[in-house]
């Protein structure tokens, strides 16, 4: 018996040694070992001194570039910049600003923020931070932001130029956490119709949305327009929380699946505050990822009408992998699928072709005409309630197509915008008339109804354009005139009030919003969906 156990032990030991040797042999011949040896050889044997960190970073970037367009590497600084808007706050002095002629112009101090508390006003120009001149020296916006931001409770000394005051005004601002809002606008767009615009899906989005929804319902809202145009996505959980507001209990919102990630399903809890009202969802070619999750769920359950243009088509699940130095790899581990089984992700034969997709879609006429878009039978799916046909193959195809309106966007208008003439002229007007306008228009509604951009203001805009190298074109000016008036009015509304009022004005030219309002005038809402069966 003793010999038998001893022999069995020898056999077990032998096989464990063989297994270990096999494992070691496998590692020694693995691609990972090959990479390690190459890096070791370069670091220790190369003729000149090398930057190992940079070499490794570039190797990681190259490797990820062979996979898909959304598997990426970010250095520690990029990780910080990427996370701030999604976390819902950052630490700084609390101002909205624009750069006007190499000078930081305060658009609005954040309500209740550190700058407002010490008396900094809209229209102030920050000239110095500590002892460093930042005005008129062509300092980059990123460099200025680095000087203004800092840890909570730290202090920064500013010198400010204020209209009507000769000397520079000194301010000491105690930095604090500053909220970053993901809702741009929330207002009653028409009797009983509310409007909410979400610019990203962040940690605070659901909380912001519920607050906005409750406020609109108190004002008598029965129907809702949810604007996701230009929304590039964000957190999956935020998208699920928003979709939950519209769907019934146990209705599937989205599922994910990948090679090493078994199917994972996310369902509505049935606790939403807007499960019954009429819903319009607006999307365009820049609506992506989390926006497409919400839109796909609404469409697949026939819960609302989708209006606009085919969305971007980003349906890859990224897992963030934190590296020891604070950098991060975002690795694609699965794909998103809508409740009907549609894959949101568009094809990616090569990264170059993928990056040119929107240009290709425009050149093929997809932005102008629904008839230019064709789907094979293999990409047709059925919705859950009404068995309508919806389409896969990348992005969400709207129920009602709205082409891009290019009639007002002339080359002259584009140059006024791109060269900064529109912004510079508007800064001049707001500087000269802020106090007068706030006295004349006691509320935004008064401003919205009565304010008009005058011929003198337009003449100043044209003159500013000429100063900045924009060649005047009478025909193109006349063609773009309605849009120029509206944009100028919207920018002034933003500076006198906030982004909510900006969108209240600028949305008058939004064709998708017009279409949604037109559809909501029809009493048979389900009929709108059945027409697209």
What are the residue ranges of the model-derived segments?
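Bacterial Sec-dependent N-terminal signal peptides
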Residues: 1-28
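Cleft-lining beta-strand/loop regions that shape enzyme active-site pockets
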Residues: 20-31, 35, 39-52, 75, ...
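Surface-exposed patches in mature extracellular/periplasmic domains of secreted proteins
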Residues: 45-58, 71-76, 224, 254-256, ...
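PDZ/PDZ-like peptide-tail recognition elements
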Residues: 58, 69-108
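Structural motif
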Residues: 123-125
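Residue-level recognition of conserved beta-strand edge/terminus positions
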Residues: 129-130, 161, 332, 347, ...
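Polar, glycine-rich mid-to-C-terminal structural blocks
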Residues: 290, 302, 309, 313-381
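Conserved functional hotspot residues or short segments at active or partner-binding sites
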Residues: 343-344, 348-533
């Amino acid at each position: 018996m003793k010999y038998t156990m001893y022999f069995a032990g020898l056999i077990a030991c032998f096989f464990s040694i063989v297994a270990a040797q096999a494992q070691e042999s496998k590692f020694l011949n693995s691609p990972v070992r090959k990479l390690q040896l190459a890096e070791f050889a370069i670091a220790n044997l190369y003729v000149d001194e090398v930057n190992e960190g940079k070499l490794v970073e570039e190797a990681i970037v190259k490797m990820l570039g062979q996979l898909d367009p959304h598997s990426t590497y970010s250095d520690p600084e990029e990780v910080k910049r990427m996370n701030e808007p999604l976390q819902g706050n950052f630490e700084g002095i609390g101002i909205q600003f624009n750069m006007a002629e190499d000078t930081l112009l305060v658009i609005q101090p954040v309500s209740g923020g550190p700058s407002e508390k010490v008396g900094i006003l809209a229209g102030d120009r920050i000239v110095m931070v500590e002892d460093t001149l930042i005005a008129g020296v062509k300092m980059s916006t990123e460099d200025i932001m680095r000087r203004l931001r800092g840890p909570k409770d730290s202090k920064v000394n500013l010198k400010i130029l204020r209209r009507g005051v000769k000397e520079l005004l000194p301010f000491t601002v105690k930095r604090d956490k500053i909220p970053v809002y993901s809702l741009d606008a929330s207002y009653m767009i028409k009797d009983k119709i509310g409007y909410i615009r979400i610019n990203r899906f962040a940690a605070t989005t659901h909380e912001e949305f519920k607050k906005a929804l409750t406020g609109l319902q108190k004002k008598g809202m029965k129907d809702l327009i949810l604007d996701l145009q230009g929304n590039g996505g964000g957190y999956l959980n935020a998208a699920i929380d928003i979709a939950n507001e519209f769907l019934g209990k146990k209705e599937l919102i989205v599922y994910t699946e990948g090679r090493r990630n078994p199917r994972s399903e996310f369902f509505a809890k049935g606790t939403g505050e807007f499960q019954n009202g009429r819903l319009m969802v607006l999307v365009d070619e820049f609506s992506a990822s989390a926006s497409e999750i919400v839109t796909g769920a609404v469409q697949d359950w026939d819960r609302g009408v989708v209006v606009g243009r085919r969305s971007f088509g980003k349906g890859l699940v990224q897992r963030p992998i934190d590296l020891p130095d604070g950098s991060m790899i975002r690795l694609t581990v699965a794909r998103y699928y809508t409740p009907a089984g549609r894959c949101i992700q568009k094809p990616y034969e090569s990264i170059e072709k993928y990056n040119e997709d929107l240009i290709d879609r425009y050149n093929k006429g997809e932005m102008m005409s629904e008839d230019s878009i064709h789907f094979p039978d293999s990409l047709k799916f059925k919705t859950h309630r009404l068995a309508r046909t919806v389409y896969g193959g990348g992005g969400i195809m709207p129920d009602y197509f709205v082409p891009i309106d290019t009639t007002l966007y002339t080359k002259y208008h584009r140059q006024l915008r791109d060269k900064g003439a529109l912004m510079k002229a508007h800064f001049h007007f707001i500087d000269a008339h802020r106090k007068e306008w706030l006295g004349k228009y006691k509320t935004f509604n008064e401003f919205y109804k009565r304010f008009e951009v005058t011929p003198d203001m337009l003449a100043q805009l044209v003159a500013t354009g000429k100063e900045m190298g924009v060649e005047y074109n009478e025909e193109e000016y006349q063609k773009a005139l309605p849009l120029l008036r509206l944009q100028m009015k919207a920018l002034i509304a933003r500076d006198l009030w906030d982004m909510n009022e900006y969108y209240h004005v600028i949305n008058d030219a939004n064709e998708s919003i017009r279409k949604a309002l037109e559809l909501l005038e029809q009493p048979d809402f389900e009929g709108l969906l059945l027409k697209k069966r």
